[in-house]
């Protein structure tokens, strides 16, 4: 193993991504076209799929394998351009006002970094650009606010230079060079448009493979000096370059082949085609290079030179004429300049923002050590303009270090000087009016993989001096258009960056900044200045409304509109549930679907397996959003239902009381003699009596509420002449009559479809034909959209196909021949015209002595919930009835006669599974659904118990690998089938097994006395060979859903529907 050599190229990944980005920008080797709005984006499927869960799921779908054009209608082109630049560069430039849209798009695309972008810290504090604001305050007033890029900039030769010295520079074009050095200078003080400095290019003799460092030099700025036209931008690739006097550097710059050469465009193109070392990964939206001409008009000396330049290159130094500063090196990784769809070129380095970066001539300056190859120097392109030279201050010349082996085509060193000294300089500006104005304070730079390892530059005294003028900052900010100011999204925390106002002991206008960017972050916390600006601007921000073009819903922000369109109007549903294969718009919906439908807490979607799961904080946030949405929906429904009755809350309460009493109609109640309302609890009844002013109630006693509304609604006769127009009740006053009529009107409301009728008789007539009655749970009066939904609700909430025995009481042994049922059948059907009879609640009957019997009014069965838990004692006989009376069947008593009168308090609600008693029915429902320790659904393979059948079904998927023959064999061993009774469920405890009977009376002897319809018989063969036992729900038989799935026991109306459903289990 000693002969093995290991080499690592840390820049390979950056170079690879950079090359891919170049291909994307040029449209080469791209295999997918994304259409967003009115713009088209070319990209590579592999890159998109590796970065986004959405694209991974979209491209891996077999239906989309051959498709190369995709239209994304859930995002805006600007936001998608920012995200695409981030994918190809790992860096992001985004305005504060667009941060919410980028976050939403990152969430929709499944990019975790962008989803949590708000919690990330930007790289550099950009809101403060005091020197620029101070210098260009007058120009901001007069300028046309257009974005500009300098594409051709003049160059002044040194005073000692001659034309003969410059000729070798021009003639030296035959040798292609790795990089080009351009000395550029702008001394024109009053350009009416804000300009961005030129990218200065450097040409060196040094070859790329050498280990060397690049010295980055900023130009000199001398205030008040009219005869200092020379600005030096020097890029040297020596390992160590000590600082030299200005004269020495000018002499060195004059030498041919060092840095003063400006080759022709052809030589530049050759240089561009030569193999280059790895480059940093940056992004640009410009695809076509521009060949521009540079003209020098200084001191009577001019030259025409061709310069290959990318016009939309974003690498510029922010201009500043006042103050001087030293620039530290940002080693935080590659940076993307994506500023309103204006991006960086692939071939340039990006220096960090600085108002001025100057070359300091010092005789005894220490040498600068070389940088690590993984570092990068970055700069931000900023809006800049000129100001009068009297505003300028003295400058310092400082050396700057640039990293080696980072440039692909040419080395970019920037020089921007704003002097009013030499007006002979000519500057050509290429204006881009299509790009809106963007202030640097609206920009946040975020880079993945921050590495603040900048100790290499600590040997040199690298500082930055910023002249701060807070009043100018406020003045400059106030001149910006309102739409370009802070547009903070109310839903997101606002990350404010501070203007550093504390001064150093030497000067209160300057502060020292170390080489580490973390020091920058520490120096820019929130400031009172920005807080005041933000508060003022947010207060004056107009309330814009954004309308969905599909459903015309209105949203406060574009982020909310994007989320709504993505969730509800996106035709593509890339995320699928692994269990039932239902498709959803977002991965989060798959997650919540699996929790609610399959009882699986973890998201089983394969799209999320390749990426990190969202952090807990974000998951809690999403859960809160869903919970808040459900609460709002419930409140809206409550308010809508409460509008016709009492105003505000009282009508909603009254309607809830009506529904609650409709549910307990067969139970004992306190009946109001004024309006006929019945209450189970005395406290509720007393509270209701207070709503009837006048006499105290007469004849209040604990009786059962009869079936018919009219006899109940007739109050005690009195001498007053005020009569209710709905129920002919006579009332004592006009006010009492109005209150009573409102109560009567609410009482005549259909509990299934909420239709209101003039009289209770009309409502009762409608109830028997109401189409929503079949889909209404008679236990809690909830209405569902499908029969499967109500069946699932009855099973999971009310346990109506309960199979577990209860230890608190003993169940009588049922006669399998049907003798008990036949003998008790006539007693269980009293006369239909009987109005008042004593009824005991189903719960009391369950816990009462086995010799007692429950009497039900057959016509009032619609008010009695279908409680299949009565099957523990009662034999259920189901018969075919007409469609409009499909729900009219009721469980009938099968035990011995019961003593008349209630034997237990009706205020106790027992759990049929564990026997625990509750005083409030809501507590019982919550206990049965979530907290009950008895789990009646047993897996026959591992004998594991579950609270609901859906959790059992989800668990059973783990056993699907076993052969179905083995499963059937196990089931036959666990539960042998008797000859005279249907197969009992495979419950682990053997003693209770004979006590539990299935719902369908499919016993051979029982069928002779009590013939069952064909719908019941169809369940028998499917139940006998099922993988795990479930009693068929009574609602399924009633709804004529004759075909049951053996795995999940969902019922279907046709065999084809069952077959289609079974394909989802394969």
Swiss-Prot record:
Residues with the Phosphoserine modification: 345, 381, 411, 422, 434-435, 438, 605, 714, 1003
Annotated BTB domain residues: 30-96
Residue segments, region Disordered: 154-196, 388-442, 454-485, 498-525, 806-840, 879-906, 963-1014
Basic and acidic residues biased stretches: 388-399, 466-478
UniProt feature, compositional bias: Polar residues: 154-177, 820-831
Biased composition (Acidic residues): 882-891
UniProt zinc finger (C2H2-type) residues: 546-569, 575-598, 670-692, 748-770, 775-798, 909-932, 937-959, 1043-1065
Coiled coil: none
Crosslink position(s): Glycyl lysine isopeptide (Lys-Gly) (interchain with G-Cter in SUMO1): 40, 879
A single GO BP: regulation of transcription by RNA polymerase II
Tissues expressing the protein: Ubiquitous in fetal and adult tissues.
Molecular functions per Gene Ontology: DNA-binding transcription factor activity, RNA polymerase II-specific; DNA-binding transcription repressor activity, RNA polymerase II-specific; identical protein binding; methyl-CpG binding; POZ domain binding; zinc ion binding
Domain of life where this protein originates: Eukaryota
Function according to Swiss-Prot or TrEMBL: Acts as a transcription repressor.
PANTHER family the UniProt entry points to: ZINC FINGER AND BTB DOMAIN-CONTAINING PROTEIN 21 (PTHR24394:SF15), ZINC FINGER PROTEIN (PTHR24394)
Assembly: Homodimer. Interacts with ZBTB14.
Protein name (database record): Zinc finger and BTB domain-containing protein 21
Lineage: Eukaryota, Metazoa, Chordata, Craniata, Vertebrata
Gene that this polypeptide is encoded by: ZBTB21
